[in-house]
A protein has these predicted regions:
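Beta-rich carbohydrate-recognition and catalytic domains
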Residues: 1-258, 266-282
């Protein structure tokens, strides 16, 4: 719900929060492929010329995958109405030998958690090969260590992606370092804090003319304990390669609060609006 910033007069008006209704045929994109044990973290774009929708979503295969780079992948689907979706057989990446998949990006190897991907269509980029931009979380081997953090890729059509040669662009922190298989993560945590984590949402900020990533991060507890609760951090870039030190922008304020698992931000009508992901662990 927006505030009264754009209302000249409000006398006699009553604010009513419209409750969305779940579609009766949900899920409209079912996890019905061998590489889709579970799916989530979607980016949707509507082509203004054709009216067709494109959706990029994370697919988790886990131990079904014979190749570790296929444990978590980025998949692609299209729709004319946003309700009936088609998963094209792109034949770009196989899954356990089957090339008839809709996979458009695979992991880096190692721990290979190609996670929390977010896609942005950027029609103003004068390089056609970079009209589609992708930010995602993955591990990269550096000096014998599997270092997690921000990775990016570019595409002319949203289907054929080229990963940027440098990764990670920002080192991140996955989470609680005492939980296996991350028991040694505390040995090489990011120098700067807060650090990005494995949920990312991209936007183009037209006011400040910069790219923004709103990412899950971790905050310390009142007792100084690390990785106490999830919160939201923001990092910015003018060129999509060099990113600022993340800044904490939203965090839980009590032990009873839900955790903040991420936020999708967009600019509309002179306002920055956000959809907050709240995590309730019960």
């Amino acid at each position: 719900m927006a505030d009264d910033n754009l209302l000249l007069y409000s006398s006699g008006l009553k604010k009513v929060l419209q409750m969305p209704a779940r579609h009766e045929n949900n899920p409209v994109i079912p996890n019905d492929k061998p590489w889709e044990l579970a799916i989530g973290y979607c980016s949707v774009h509507r082509d203004p010329t054709t009216g067709e929708y494109a959706c990029w979503y994370q697919s988790y295969a886990g131990n079904r995958a014979q190749d570790p780079t296929r444990r978590v992948t980025l998949c692609y689907a299209t729709s004319k109405d946003g309700l009936t979706w088609t998963k094209p057989k792109l034949r770009l990446f196989d899954f356990n030998g089957d090339l008839d998949t809709n996979i458009v990006l695979v992991g880096n190897g190692g721990r290979s958690v190609n996670y929390g991907a977010s896609v942005l269509f950027d029609p103003t980029d004068n390089q056609p090969g970079k009209r589609y931009k992708l930010a995602y979380w993955d591990f990269t081997e550096n000096e014998g260590l599997q270092t997690p953090g921000l990775c990016v890729a570019f595409s002319p059509d949203g289907i054929r992606w080229k990963k940027h040669s440098k990764a990670p662009l920002l080192q991140g922190s996955y989470g609680e370092p005492t939980q296996p298989p991350f028991s040694n993560e505390s040995d090489h945590l990011p120098a700067g804090r807060p650090a990005i984590s494995d949920v990312m949402d991209l936007m183009w900020d037209p006011v400040n003319e910069q790219y923004c990533i709103y990412s899950k991060t971790w905050i310390d507890g009142p007792d100084g304990r690390r990785f106490w609760k999830r919160a939201v951090a923001r990092t910015t870039s003018k060129d999509f390669i060099n990113w600022s030190q993340p800044q904490l922008i939203l965090s839980p304020n009590s032990r009873e609060d839900h955790q903040f698992h991420g936020a999708s931000i967009f600019y509309e009508g002179g306002l920055y609006l956000g959809l907050l992901q709240k995590l309730d662990l019960g």
